[in-house]
């Protein structure tokens, strides 16, 4: 495995994307630790008939992959089969930061914080237009979870163009002991020890049908009323007030700077990821995880003392 990584760092990473040499090198990196058997299913396609089904069911150049995130293996696996451009999402902003393979792997063992200098951040729509021949991979949760739930999504997917296809992808592992929900050096050591001490791991991959982010004006025109409109005779000043309050709620922004309508769009993606992974959604995001990690770290230091 060390030799395979040496070949990648010294030579293969500089070769053009999608070449046979890159794929072979990445398959060696992912296969040597025992990650061989991959269970792949695609929405709307019967098992074993993916190549025979018409239409595009797999991510293609110019599209975006929105994947669940639990382990560094997510990144290695996606790099092996899709060779995408990885991105880092952040709370409170729709912009993302392009990452190299090594930077994406390193991000699994730390909590992302938006950089003070935002010159390196850009929307997904611009990244797709700059690289029309590549697939863009994003982890909208922004940080690995424990594999038992989908965290609250960051707003990064909202920066995609309404014309761009977004493929939800769920990645799970059996046994589920190579997840890295807690950042830090100890988590990295524990991950590598578990990975190398187990003979084999299975990747369960579920790819959903492509979705799109609705245009802002189209989303705003779907108010989804919560009350029945009275007759024109019964309509009065209070009906007008109620409509105005609903309109204000739809444009009012939360702590992440997104509106209620945009939150519904993110909920749609989160529901799909939860369905594909057969897990639950939780109302915890990266901010809550940061508080938990801080408390957990203090508790661990206290027990050691």
Outline where the language-model segments fall.
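Eukaryotic N-terminal targeting leaders
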Residues: 1, 44-58, 284-305
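N-terminal membrane-anchoring alpha-helices
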Residues: 1-39, 292-305
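Catalytic core of membrane glycerolipid acyltransferases/transacylases, capturing the structured
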Residues: 15-27, 36-39, 54-118
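Beta-strand elements of modular eukaryotic interaction domains
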Residues: 27-29, 38-56, 126-128, 194-195
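Generic beta-sheet signal
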Residues: 61-67, 132-140, 164
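A Trp-anchored, charged/polar loop motif used as the substrate-binding/catalytic surface
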Residues: 114-129
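A cross-family acyltransferase "interaction/gating" segment
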Residues: 134-135, 142-256
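Cytosolic terminal low-complexity segments enriched in Ser/Thr and acidic residues
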Residues: 231-276, 283-286, 290
């Amino acid at each position: 495995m060390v030799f395979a990584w040496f070949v990648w760092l010294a030579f293969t990473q500089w070769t053009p994307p999608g070449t046979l040499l890159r794929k072979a090198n990445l398959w060696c990196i992912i296969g040597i630790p025992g990650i061989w058997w991959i269970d792949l299913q695609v929405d709307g396609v019967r098992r074993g008939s993916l190549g025979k089904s018409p239409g595009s069911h797999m991510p293609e150049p110019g599209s975006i992959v929105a994947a669940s995130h639990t382990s560094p293996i997510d990144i290695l696996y996606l790099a092996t089969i899709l060779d995408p451009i990885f991105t880092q999402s952040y709370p409170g902003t729709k912009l993302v930061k392009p990452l190299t393979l090594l930077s994406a792997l390193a991000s699994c063992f730390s909590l992302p914080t938006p950089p003070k200098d935002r010159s390196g951040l850009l929307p997904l729509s611009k990244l797709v237009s700059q690289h029309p021949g590549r697939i863009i991979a994003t982890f909208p949760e922004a940080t690995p979870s424990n594999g038992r739930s989908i965290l609250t999504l960051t707003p990064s997917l909202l920066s995609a163009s309404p014309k761009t296809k977004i493929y939800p992808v769920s990645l799970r592992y059996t046994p589920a002991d190579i997840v890295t929900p807690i950042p830090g050096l100890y988590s990295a050591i524990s991950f590598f020890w578990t990975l190398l001490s187990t003979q084999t791991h299975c990747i369960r991959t579920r790819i959903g049908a492509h979705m799109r982010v609705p245009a802002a004006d189209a989303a705003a025109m779907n108010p989804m009323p919560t009350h029945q409109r009275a007759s024109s005779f019964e309509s009065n000043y209070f009906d007008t007030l109620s409509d105005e309050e609903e309109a204000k709620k739809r444009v009012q922004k939360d702590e992440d700077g997104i509106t209620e309508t945009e939150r519904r769009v993110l909920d749609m993606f989160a529901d799909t990821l939860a369905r594909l992974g057969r897990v639950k959604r939780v109302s915890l995001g990266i901010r809550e995880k940061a508080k938990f990690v801080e408390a957990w770290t203090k508790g661990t230091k206290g027990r050691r003392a």
